[in-house]
C-alpha cells in the first residue's frame, strides 16, 4: 500500500500541532522520508525579530519567572534588528539516527545581538518546542498507520441471502482522501486519535454459494468505522448495489 493517505494525515497533524503551540503560519512541517518513515517530520520556515519575540513570549507562559525572563530578554534584544530565525532539514548524506538530528535551527549573525550563552539557550528552547511536537506526531503516526491497515481480525461482516453470500473484510488499499481538504483531514484525525476509529478500506465480496464462485467485488474507501458500530453505519450502499448488480449479471455456470 502507498502511504499517500497516511502522509497527508501525519502532515496535517504536525501543522495543526505547530499552530496550536503558537508557531506562526510561516512555519510548517515537512516529511523527512515519507515512504520509509512516514512519522518523521521537521519544521521549515523563517521568523523575523517581531515573530520571534511573539513566539517566545507565548511559549514562555508556563515557565517559571526567572527562566521566562531570561528568554524574553534575549528575544527583546532582537527587536528592531534584521535578525531572522531559520528552520530547515539538516543536510546529511544519510538519514539521521535520531529525529532531533533531522532539523537545523539557525540564527545568522546572532553574535551581533546576543552572547553565545543567550543564543544557545534561546535556540535550545525553540528547538525543544519543535522536538516535543515532532515526537508526539511520531508516536501518533503509529496509531494512524494501524487504523489504515487491516487488523488481525479483518472480517467485518458475513451475510447470506439465499444462494448469495456477502463478505466484508478490511482491505490493504489506498484511501482517496484529499490532502488539501483540511476539514476532512481534521475529522479523520479526531476520529482515529480521540475516538479510536478505524479508517481502513473495506473489500465487499459477493459469492454464489451454490456455484462456490466469487461473482463480484468492490472496495469501500474513505469511511470511518467507530468501535461497536453496526454494519449499517459504515456500509456504502452504492458499492453494495454495484457489486450485487455485477454479480447478478454474471452468467450462471
Please name every model-derived segment.
Residues 1-253:
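Acidic interaction surfaces
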Amino acid at each position: 500500500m502507498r502511504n499517500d493517505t497516511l502522509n497527508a494525515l501525519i502532515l496535517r497533524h504536525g501543522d495543526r500541532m505547530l499552530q496550536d503551540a503558537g508557531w506562526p503560519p510561516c512555519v510548517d512541517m515537512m516529511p523527512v522520508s515519507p515512504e520509509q518513515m512516514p512519522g518523521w517530520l521537521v519544521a521549515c520556515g523563517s521568523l523575523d525579530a517581531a515573530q520571534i519575540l511573539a513566539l517566545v513570549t507565548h511559549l514562555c507562559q508556563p515557565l517559571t519567572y526567572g527562566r521566562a525572563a531570561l528568554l524574553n530578554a534575549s528575544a527583546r534584544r532582537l527587536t528592531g534588528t534584521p535578525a531572522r530565525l531559520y528552520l530547515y532539514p539538516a543536510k546529511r548524506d544519510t538519514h539521521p539516527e535520531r529525529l532531533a538530528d533531522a532539523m537545523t535551527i539557525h540564527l545568522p549573525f546572532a553574535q551581533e545581538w546576543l552572547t553565545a550563552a543567550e543564543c544557545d539557550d534561546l535556540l535550545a528552547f525553540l528547538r525543544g518546542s519543535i522536538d516535543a511536537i515532532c515526537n508526539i506526531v511520531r508516536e501518533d503516526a503509529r496509531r494512524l498507520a494501524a487504523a489504515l491497515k487491516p487488523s488481525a481480525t479483518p472480517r467485518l461482516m458475513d451475510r447470506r441471502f439465499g444462494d448469495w453470500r456477502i463478505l466484508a473484510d478490511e482491505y490493504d488499499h489506498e484511501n482517496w482522501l484529499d490532502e488539501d481538504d483540511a476539514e476532512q483531514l481534521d475529522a479523520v484525525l479526531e476520529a482515529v486519535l480521540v475516538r479510536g476509529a478505524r479508517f481502513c478500506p473495506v473489500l465487499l465480496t459477493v459469492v454464489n454459494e451454490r456455484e462456490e464462485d466469487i461473482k463480484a467485488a468492490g472496495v469501500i474507501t474513505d469511511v470511518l468505522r467507530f468501535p461497536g458500530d453496526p454494519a449499517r453505519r459504515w456500509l456504502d450502499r452504492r458499492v453494495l448495489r454495484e457489486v450485487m448488480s455485477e454479480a447478478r449479471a454474471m452468467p450462471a455456470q
